[in-house]
């Protein structure tokens, strides 16, 4: 009788293990390193919404120097070309956190960002460390469009002449 009870308990336990299956597939992500960020990225969504027409942000990361070039048009009627350096730190609770500093003594980025879902297919999510509602989705692209480089270069030359 004891053996039947043990076998029944074992059979129930094994059935429970077999029935426990995660229906969602695990999508592999890349480790957040300067090498995996290297290249050109376009901001495609801000807080789940596509960018308004006429606004853009392209970031070009250089893994060797850990520098960035940014072409953006958000808070001004003119495009801006911004340069600086970045660093990635691994927080044991949050994961990879990216931060940056602008060149020419213009200070640090307003936020540090938790980088998640860095996909081999070419997308990643940045969430502001101090504001979980500030979420940015970047997609990898081949290069910054020439007209945007020209627009950013024009603004750069205007700034230096002022």
Feature map (PLM): residue ranges:
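N-terminal glycine/threonine-rich, aromatic-flanked beta-hairpin/loop signature
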Residues: 51-97
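C-terminal motif of bacterial Sec signal peptides marking the signal peptidase cleavage site
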Residues: 15-19
């Amino acid at each position: 009788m004891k053996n039947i009870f043990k076998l029944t308990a074992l059979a129930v336990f094994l059935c429970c293990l077999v029935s426990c299956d995660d229906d969602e597939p695990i999508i592999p992500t890349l480790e957040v390193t300067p090498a995996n960020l290297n290249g050109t990225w376009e901001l495609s969504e801000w807080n789940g919404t596509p960018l308004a027409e006429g606004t853009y942000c392209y970031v070009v990361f250089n893994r060797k120097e850990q520098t960035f070039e940014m072409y953006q048009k958000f808070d001004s009627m003119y495009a801006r070309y911004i340069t600086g350096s970045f660093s990635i730190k691994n927080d044991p609770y949050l994961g990879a956190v990216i931060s940056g500093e602008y060149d020419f003594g213009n200070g640090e980025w307003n936020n540090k960002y938790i980088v998640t879902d860095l996909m081999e297919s070419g997308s990643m999510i940045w969430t502001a460390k101090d504001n979980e509602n500030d979420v940015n989705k970047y997609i990898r692209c081949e290069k910054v469009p020439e007209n945007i480089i020209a627009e950013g270069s024009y603004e750069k030359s205007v700034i230096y002449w002022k």
